[in-house]
Amino acid sequence: STQAGRVRNLEAGEICSEIYTAQKDIGERISHIVLMGIGEPLDNFDEVMRFLENISSPEGVNIGMRNISLSTCGLVPKIDQLAEKKLQLTLSVSLHAPNNDIRSGMMPVNDAYPVEVLMQAVRRYQETTGRRVSFEYSMVRGVNDSDACARQLADLIRGMGAHVNLIPINPVDGSPYSATDAANVRRFQQKLESLGVNATVRRRLGSEISAACGQLRRDEMNGKV
């Protein structure tokens, strides 16, 4: 989805309207929220903070901060700014690689905020807020799914009490990347757990009809749906 480039940031009211629309469509109260793409939530800091204030208010949807996760690709100054708010939400860091060589190839933001700088910011965030952090790790065949990568990842976050979500990537036309197969994802998870890191394999939903994360919006913009 991000291959189309940035258009604009959403305003707080627009983000709130997504919650109200979803509640109306399903006929149930929304109890948990994940702020995760398209785009970088911390790049829209003021509007996201306004949204969080509104959505957690008893006069709004009254969703507790502990039921809200906020994702970031690793904007270090914004992580520090968020820490100052001392919100009780869960920070979810899109790490995807345990070292700079691999991460810079996958995520250009790593050139500005390399792994060691990012991890320092995450530890500061934990110290300031007292909240556990989770790490998102997209599994890419032959890129970041080796035993060596598992060991490096464990060394990077061991002792933080953090949780790792392992996510087999969804196929996208024109991408050189493919997902790690299920057996090797499981092997990677077991390796992390043997090294003292709590890890979960994220379920893949919708990829068989190109409606999974990163797929549907791109296909719609390209006139395929």
Go through each PLM region and give its residues.
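Amphipathic, soluble alpha/beta structural segments
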Residues: 1-2, 29, 155-156, 215, ...
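Short, flexible micro-motifs
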Residues: 8, 40-42, 77, 209, ...
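Conserved AdoMet/S-adenosylmethionine-binding subsite of the radical SAM
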Residues: 14-195, 199
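Canonical Radical SAM [4Fe-4S] cluster-binding loop centered on the CxxxCxxC motif
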Residues: 1-13
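Short glycine- and Lys/Arg-enriched binding-loop motifs that mark or flank ligand-binding interfaces
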Residues: 35, 202, 210
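Short secondary-structure capping/turn micro-motifs that flank functional sites
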Residues: 6, 142, 172-173, 207-209
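Short beta->alpha linker loops
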Residues: 74, 204-205
